Amino acid sequence: MSLKINNFNFLRPISRKKHRKKIKLNCLNLPFKGKDIWTLYELSWLNKNGLPQIAIAKIEIDVNSANIIESKSFKIYINSFNQMKFNNNIDFINILTNDLTKCICGQISIKLFSLDAIKNETITDFHGICIDNQNIKIESYKYTPSFLMINSERKIIKEDLYTHLFKSNCPVTQQPDWASIYIAYTGLSINHASLLRYLISFRSHNEFHEECIERIFNDINNICKPEELSVYARYTRRGGIDINPWRSNTNFSPFLTRLARQ
């Protein structure tokens, strides 16, 4: 390894606890499990002979870690390896694992994929009902959890819903964060129009990806009170990175392949 740089100092940790307290989650007894899944498309370093190497990385950060990582700082951190030599890929992964584990104060997994290994991955879509094509009027783009409603019939159903219309904003740069949101639940029927209005109400809301998804989970859980609930977001790529957090109180396994906008 060459170019001795303290790459770790580029990383900016953001405490999960502050936001969780803000939305009145019990930090010692979270109502969900989950992970934040990062895909890195612009990852490069040098081998021991100085030949540039490239890979796509998939990183999974456990929901019980103390911190998330501010994405701009993460991009700067990743780019700091572009001119560094490593004897092999294992050495590179070990550096990433040690630095990121220290930053988040929690569990992390990192896998590198060659282009050949993923070239046959297909673009997929969420399964279930897309709620985007409703003939409804939208009048508010300010975060409004009270939009959420259940239907009048008192029948327990199991339903998978999704939207591609979600937008929130980065609290650091105020740039838009675009996402597709998947919601699977078992419980009293959630009114589709109310759910879409609620999700669109994030359009002027400033919050990190992970925080938005925990807020959505918490709002639906508290207002609609489903027996089971899973919320999964796949955000579009920015700076060569997409972030895909999920939260669930049941046995949920998210698919990890790209959506059309990723």
UniProtKB/Swiss-Prot annotation:
Query: Which amino acids does the record list as binding substrate?
Result: I69, E70, S71, H209, E210
* SUPFAM superfamilies referenced in this protein's UniProt entry, alphabetically: Tetrahydrobiopterin biosynthesis enzymes-like (SSF55620)
Look up keyword Cytoplasm and say if it applies. yes
Instruction: Give the enzyme class.
Output: oxidoreductase
Q: Name one GO molecular function term.
A: preQ1 synthase activity
Q: Which Gene3D superfamilies match?
A: 3.30.1130.10
- EC number(s) stated in the UniProt entry for this protein: 1.7.1.13
Q: Which is a Gene Ontology cellular component entry for this protein?
A: cytoplasm
Instruction: Give the record's pathway.
Output: tRNA modification; tRNA-queuosine biosynthesis
Q: Which InterPro entries match?
A: GTP-CH-I_C/QueF, NADPH_dep_7-cyano-7-deazaG_red, QueF, QueF_N, QueF_type2
Q: What biological processes does GO assign it?
A: queuosine biosynthetic process; tRNA modification
Protein's cellular compartments = Cytoplasm
**UniProt-annotated binding residues for NADPH:** S71, K72, R238, G239
Q: What does this protein do?
A: Catalyzes the NADPH-dependent reduction of 7-cyano-7-deazaguanine (preQ0) to 7-aminomethyl-7-deazaguanine (preQ1).
Q: Which family does it belong to?
A: Belongs to the GTP cyclohydrolase I family. QueF type 2 subfamily.
Q: Which HAMAP family match?
A: QueF_type2 (MF_00817)
| Subunit structure and binding partners | Homodimer.
Protein name in the entry: NADPH-dependent 7-cyano-7-deazaguanine reductase
Please report the organism this UniProt entry assigns to the protein. Answer: Buchnera aphidicola subsp. Schizaphis graminum (strain Sg)
